[in-house]
Every structure is written in structure tokens, then in C-alpha cells.
Amino acid sequence: MIETVTDLSRLRGIVADWRRQGLRVALVPTMGNLHAGHFSLVMLARHYADRVVSSVFVNPTQFGPHEDFRRYPRTPEADMRGLEHVGCDVLWLPSVETMYPLGTERTVRLFVPCVSDVLEGTFRPGHFEGVCTVVARLFNQVLPDVAVFGKKDYQQLVVIRQMVVDLAFPIEILGGCIVRESDGLAMSSRNQYLSMQERPQAAEIHRTLIAMRDAVMSGGVHADVEAEAVRRLEAAGFQVDYAVIRLSDLGEPIDGTVISPGIALVAARLGNTRLIDNLEF
């Protein structure tokens, strides 16, 4: 049976007891409003660890001034039931005061240069600073052997991997595959913001990513592939932030070279909802 923990000393006591038993510990950080994509990360964690802690914390420092922090969906009871069903051992529910004892304005912040400044970093300044700050705190609280993050937030995964290397966290970082709806739309807590009319349109992002991948693999010029992706998405009603081809480390590829492994990434708004997705190849 899952145990819900809100006290840091209690959490550390549980983890210390696991350590004394020689058990391997995994962490799955989330912001709640969990869906099948999140639960797949917990199931992946169970393959690599004996015990799994999942955190639910809507982190204020990773939201910009005009983003959806206050209206971000919070579903604690459903989250707990779902986590218990997939075998999570501890649900860690820290308060803002626990995560930021000096307040969010005075807190020490972490910044990963270069990879944090592009793509999402351009459109959401300060976002990855908030992500790294809260993830590092979760690492110090749980002291996991393994931490699992979803590949839908691919840039976040790259940023966290760099942070772990640079700060010498003794933690293995795993990326969980994107879980999709039947029409290809990547599962996301923000999908519920879509109207009934917008929901079918949203699947065009995945179809566009497939077209981008196929065009690149057929030798298409990257700039032309990206421009066609933007045109296609705009024709479907999206306001496009970016549609790009990158190397797996998010470096920019050189036209005419073989990209392997590579990735196509899209961020676009449909109505009031901002969606991100990617496709590795």
C-alpha cells in the first residue's frame, strides 16, 4: 500500500530504512494531474529499482509571469490512487515552504548554460532554472539511485542529464518513452485545456513530426523541412514557436550530413493551449 508523506524527516527516515536493507531507490518527479504517461514512468522505475518514490509538487519557480501556475490542474486523490495501482511505494507531497524555506525570491538557483538558452529557453525564460533548482532539491531529499523523466519534455531531460554530470550527482537518469493517444497526440496534463473543436486538430503536431522525420531521412534540406513544418502547422490553425531538426544533444546539424541519432521538435499554440512534442529518429 502506498504511503503519502508530507514531512521531510519522515521521508528521509523511510529512505534510510530502505538503504539499510540494501534496496535500490528510484524517484519519479511530477507536478501531478497524472495520466498514463506518468504512470508508465513509475512502471519503468520499478524495473530499475526495488522501491519507488514519486513526488507531486507544482513548482512555482518554473512558471513564467503569464503562465498557468494558478490554474494548473491539481488532482491529489486521483494521483494517489493511480500511483498505488502501478506500484509506487511513497507519494512525496512537499509544501512550498519545505521546498523553498527562504522563499522563492531568496532561494539559491541552478542554471545549466547553453542547452537551457535555446528552444524552450527562448520562449520560457527562467523555466529551466526553476526546473533544475527543484529537481536538485528533490535529489537531495530522496537520494535516489535512479530518476525517471519523460521524453515528451526532451529538452528538460537533456538539461537534467547535464546538471547531473556537472554536479556529480550519483544518480542514473532514465528517459521514459512518450505515451500517445490513439490519434498520436502526446499525453499531457495540458491537453484538457483543449476545446472539443481543438482536440482533433492537436494531433496534427504528431503528423507533422512524422513528416519532418521522413523528409530528413530522405535527404531533405533541414531549413526547408522546418519551413514546411511551420507552414503545415499554421495552416492547421497553430501559432508556432518552433519546429526544428536537431541532433540528439540538441546541437544544430549541418545540412547534407547524416543525422543519427536525431530529433524533430515542435512547440505550438492551439487557441490558449501551448503544446510540445518531439520524435526521435
From Swiss-Prot:
Task: Please name the InterPro entries in this protein's record.
Answer: Pantoate_ligase (IPR003721), Pantoate_ligase_C (IPR042176), Rossmann-like_a/b/a_fold (IPR014729)
User: Which terms under GO biological process does the entry name?
Assistant: pantothenate biosynthetic process
Q: In which pathway does it act?
A: Cofactor biosynthesis; (R)-pantothenate biosynthesis; (R)-pantothenate from (R)-pantoate and beta-alanine: step 1/1
Binding positions (ATP):
31-38, 150-153, 179, 187-190
Q: Which residues does the record give as (R)-pantoate binding sites?
A: 62, 156
Reaction(s) catalysed by this chain's protein: (R)-pantoate + beta-alanine + ATP = (R)-pantothenate + AMP + diphosphate + H(+)
**Which residues make up the binding site for beta-alanine?**
62
Q: Which GO terms describe its cellular component?
A: cytosol
Q: Name one Pfam family in it.
A: Pantoate_ligase
Q: Where is the active site?
A: 38
- Is Secreted set as a keyword in this record? no
Where does it live in the cell? Cytoplasm
EC numbers for this chain: 6.3.2.1
Query: Which keywords belong to this entry?
Result: ATP-binding, Cytoplasm, Ligase, Nucleotide-binding, Pantothenate biosynthesis
GO MF annotations for this entry?
A: ATP binding; pantoate-beta-alanine ligase activity
Q: What is the top EC class of this enzyme, as a single word?
A: ligase
SUPFAM superfamilies, alphabetized: Nucleotidylyl transferase
- NCBIfam families this protein is in? panC (TIGR00018)
How this chain assembles, per its entry, is: Homodimer.
UniProt similarity note: Belongs to the pantothenate synthetase family.
Q: What does this protein do?
A: Catalyzes the condensation of pantoate with beta-alanine in an ATP-dependent reaction via a pantoyl-adenylate intermediate.
The extra comment attached to this record reads:
The reaction proceeds by a bi uni uni bi ping pong mechanism.
In Swiss-Prot or TrEMBL terms, this protein is called Pantothenate synthetase
Its organism's taxonomic lineage begins at: Bacteria, Pseudomonadati, Pseudomonadota, Gammaproteobacteria, Lysobacterales
